[in-house]
Structures are given as structure tokens and as C-alpha cells.
């Protein structure tokens, strides 16, 4: 992802309902959808509005897949790939149906640690600010990814 990216994310009651169902949250009856706040991890659903989201399958484009043998990876990998290590959200107010969020994602902190089996572990933080249709801050999300300098030794 580029250093900074901005996306628009319309929050709909049915989108919140489907998200709740997908995580096994049935606390809100379907009849109360229009007044129900989104669950805490819902802001990450902005990925559905990102045309360049790296996990999206695209017709005719090899995908790295999730099986034992990734379908879109050819040859010997140069690293172990990436790992989603952490996700944190700080809410100023709940995300509600009817909100239109503008999300600005940017690179946060980066740091390294040494690993015996994979060389350097490179940590990268992504910071996402979610602002509503009035420009007011609703939520700040921080995610940390880790990649390795080389594939992990299998010994």
C-alpha cells in the first residue's frame, strides 16, 4: 500500500447486520438494525470498499490462496510472507448506520527484531483515521504486520 490512502465507506445497517452474523454476534435483533452501533472490529470492513485490497480475488490474476500450496506463488518464496500481528481500535464515538466514513490510512511506526530462524523480523504499523460526514473523528485503528527477512528455517 502507498504511504497514504483515502477511502469513503458508507455504513449501512444491513452491512453491520451481516458483519455481526459473520462473527457470531446475534445480540441485536434484525428489527433493531437502524439504531444498532457497529461491533468494535467493524471499521476494518473498509477493505470491502478498497479496489486495491491485497486479499481480494481478481478474475484472471493468480492469487496466493490459503491452502498448503498457494496457487499464485511460483518458485521458491523469498520470505515467509506477512503476518497480521495486532489490531487496536480507539473509539471517540460508536460507528452507526447512516455514517459515511472517510478513512485515511498511513504508515505508522516501523521497527525490527532479530530472529534465530528467519533473520530480521520487520514490524510495520498502519494507522487508520475514520472521520464522519461532518469531518469529525470517530475512530482510530492501528494494525501491525510482521514480515521476515528470509523464509523460516524448518530445522
Residue ranges and their predicted role:
Residues 1, 86-155:
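HotDog/MaoC-like acyl-thioester-processing domains
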Residues 1-86, 152-155:
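Hot-dog-fold acyl-thioester-processing enzymes
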Amino acid at each position: 500500500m502507498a504511504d497514504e490512502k483515502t477511502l469513503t465507506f458508507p455504513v449501512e445497517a444491513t452491512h453491520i447486520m451481516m458483519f455481526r452474523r459473520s462473527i457470531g454476534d446475534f445480540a441485536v435483533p434484525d428489527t433493531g438494525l437502524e439504531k444498532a452501533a457497529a461491533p468494535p472490529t467493524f471499521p476494518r470492513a473498509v477493505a470491502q470498499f478498497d479496489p486495491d485490497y491485497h486479499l481480494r480475488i481478481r478474475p484472471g490474476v493468480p492469487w496466493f490462496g490459503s491452502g498448503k500450496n498457494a496457487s499464485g506463488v511460483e518458485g521458491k518464496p523469498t520470505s515467509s510472507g506477512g503476518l497480521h500481528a495486532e489490531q487496536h481500535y480507539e473509539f471517540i464515538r460508536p460507528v452507526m448506520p447512516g455514517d459515511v466514513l472517510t478513512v485515511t490510512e498511513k504508515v505508522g511506526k516501523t521497527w525490527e527484531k532479530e530472529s534465530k530462524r528467519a533473520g530480521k523480523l520487520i514490524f510495520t504499523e498502519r494507522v487508520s483515521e475514520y472521520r464522519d460526514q461532518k469531518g469529525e473523528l470517530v475512530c482510530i485503528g492501528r494494525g501491525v504486520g510482521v514480515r521476515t527477512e528470509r523464509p523460516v528455517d524448518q530445522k
